[in-house]
């Protein structure tokens, strides 16, 4: 095929197009006139309806005037504003937004293929909001846990430093080695008279004269942690007892006996401190007092816990509530 073009000059210019074998053999497709429907899976069209930038379905489609590639309006405008002013697909130069034109026909085609797209996008937004909320809560709880650990370490270091400066402190007790190291969360009352005074024994158990919270031992990190609210028994404890509510966080593998031994040592040490004594022999003698651990049942009764029960077993058997487990203590009857 050739074409001659006459110009103002003396010689005509001619162009010749060489057709390939495919172009020579091809025939136009016949139009469908009998109502035949061809079923095409929407999944097979996904690559054609996908924005190359956000990899999601095209929304408010914009087409480049130069290379005819399609993008979401927000995606391509953001790319031109922050990128190299070129097509993200073929790298052809795009000067500005004037190199783009809206493509409402393509949007209409997408809405025809996916008539429930608004519902899909609303569902997608709800899922993303739920994921973001969950991640934010996880980040917050992780930050709080890390902060509490750092505070516990700082308290422990201050206690040891104070012990070194004073030249005195309680020694490690063999029975209390099963108890958790201290991480104090005290309910401190207002007023200068309630300032906390802290001491620390060699095992790292931090003590103060206010409400105490105990953290899990590092060697027990693999076990699940359980939070406890430890209160004196409302009827078996005498009114003049100086017992206080204690907040404890320890391993689920710890047993009721561990709590009883910890309580005996802790109360004995506080009693000696109130009397101005710090002799280890006096501490061993005073800590021989035994305590019984109780839990309140749904009927309002107090059940004595077996000393061999782990705290995890107690929680599964008696508590079954997603909040700190409430336990009660009182001196064992034969020691009263």
UniProtKB/Swiss-Prot annotation:
Molecular function per GO: chromatin binding; histone H2AK119 ubiquitin ligase activity; RING-like zinc finger domain binding; ubiquitin protein ligase activity; zinc ion binding
Location(s), subcellular: Nucleus; Cytoplasm; Chromosome
Stretches with biased composition (Polar residues): 176-191
Region (Interaction with nucleosomes via an acidic patch on histone H2A and histone H2B): 93-98
Listed EC numbers: 2.3.2.27
Pathway in which the depicted protein is active: Protein modification; protein ubiquitination
GO biological process: anterior/posterior axis specification; chromatin organization; epigenetic regulation of gene expression; gastrulation with mouth forming second; gene expression; germ cell development; mitotic cell cycle; negative regulation of transcription by RNA polymerase II
Annotated catalysed reactions: S-ubiquitinyl-[E2 ubiquitin-conjugating enzyme]-L-cysteine + [acceptor protein]-L-lysine = [E2 ubiquitin-conjugating enzyme]-L-cysteine + N(6)-ubiquitinyl-[acceptor protein]-L-lysine
Location of the region described as Interaction with HIP2 in the Swiss-Prot/TrEMBL record: 2-179
First-level EC class: transferase
InterPro entries in the cross-refs: RAWUL, RING1/RING2, RING2_RAWUL_dom, Znf_RING, Znf_RING/FYVE/PHD, Znf_RING_CS
Expression across tissues: Expressed in embryonic stem cells.
Post-translational modification: Monoubiquitinated, by auto-ubiquitination. Polyubiquitinated in the presence of UBE2D3 (in vitro).
Crosslinked residue numbers (Glycyl lysine isopeptide (Lys-Gly) (interchain with G-Cter in ubiquitin)): 112
Entry superkingdom: Eukaryota
Covalent cross-link Glycyl lysine isopeptide (Lys-Gly) (interchain with G-Cter in SUMO2), where: 249, 323
Positions annotated as zinc finger (RING-type): 51-91
Record PANTHER family: E3 UBIQUITIN-PROTEIN LIGASE RING1 / RING 2 FAMILY MEMBER, E3 UBIQUITIN-PROTEIN LIGASE RING2
Subunit structure comment from the entry: Component of chromatin-associated Polycomb (PcG) complexes. Component of a number of PRC1-like complexes; these complexes contain either the polycomb group ring finger protein PCGF1, or PCGF2, or PCGF3, or BMI1, or PCGF5, or PCGF6. Distinct PRC1-like complexes are composed of a RING1 subunit (RING1B or RING1A), one of the six PCGF proteins (PCGF1, PCGF2, PCGF3, BMI1, PCGF5 or PCGF6), one PHC protein (PHC1, PHC2 or PHC3) and one of the CBX proteins (CBX2, CBX4, CBX6, CBX7 or CBX8).
Physiological role: E3 ubiquitin-protein ligase that mediates monoubiquitination of 'Lys-119' of histone H2A (H2AK119Ub), thereby playing a central role in histone code and gene regulation. H2AK119Ub gives a specific tag for epigenetic transcriptional repression and participates in X chromosome inactivation of female mammals. May be involved in the initiation of both imprinted and random X inactivation.
Official protein name in the record: E3 ubiquitin-protein ligase RING2
Species of the source: Mus musculus
Species lineage: Eukaryota, Metazoa, Chordata, Craniata, Vertebrata
């Amino acid at each position: 095929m050739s074409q001659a073009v006459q110009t103002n000059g003396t010689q005509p210019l001619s162009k010749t197009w060489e057709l390939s074998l495919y172009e020579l053999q091809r025939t136009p497709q016949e139009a469908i006139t009998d109502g035949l429907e061809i079923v095409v899976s929407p999944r097979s069209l996904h690559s054609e309806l996908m924005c190359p930038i956000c990899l999601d379905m095209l929304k408010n489609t914009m087409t480049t005037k130069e290379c005819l590639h399609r993008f979401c309006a927000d995606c391509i405008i953001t790319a031109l504003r922050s990128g190299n002013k070129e097509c993200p697909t073929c790298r052809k130069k795009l000067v500005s937004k004037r190199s783009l034109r809206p493509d409402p026909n393509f949007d209409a085609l997408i809405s025809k293929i996916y008539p429930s797209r608004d519902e899909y996008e609303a569902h997608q937004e709800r899922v993303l909001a739920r994921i973001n909320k969950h991640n934010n809560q996880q980040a917050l709880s992780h930050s709080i846990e890390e902060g509490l650990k750092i505070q516990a370490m700082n308290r422990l270091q201050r206690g040891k430093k104070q012990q070194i400066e004073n030249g005195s402190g309680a020694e490690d007790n063999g029975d209390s080695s099963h108890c958790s190291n201290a991480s104090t969360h005290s309910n401190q009352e207002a007023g200068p008279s309630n300032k906390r005074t802290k001491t620390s024994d060699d095992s790292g158990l931090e003590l103060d004269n206010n409400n105490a919270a105990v953290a899990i031992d590092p060697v027990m990190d693999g076990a699940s942690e359980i939070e406890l609210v430890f209160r004196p028994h409302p009827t078996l404890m005498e009114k003049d007892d100086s017992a206080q509510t204690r907040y404890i966080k320890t391993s689920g593998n710890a047993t009721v006996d561990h709590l009883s031994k910890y309580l005996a040592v802790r109360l004995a040490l506080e009693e000696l401190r109130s009397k101005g004594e710090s002799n280890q022999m006096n501490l061993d003698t005073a800590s021989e007092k035994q305590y019984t651990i109780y839990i309140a049942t749904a009927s309002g009764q107090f059940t004595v816990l077996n000393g061999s029960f782990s705290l995890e077993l107690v929680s599964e058997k008696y508590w079954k509530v997603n909040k700190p487990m409430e336990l009660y203590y009182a001196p064992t009857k034969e020691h009263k």
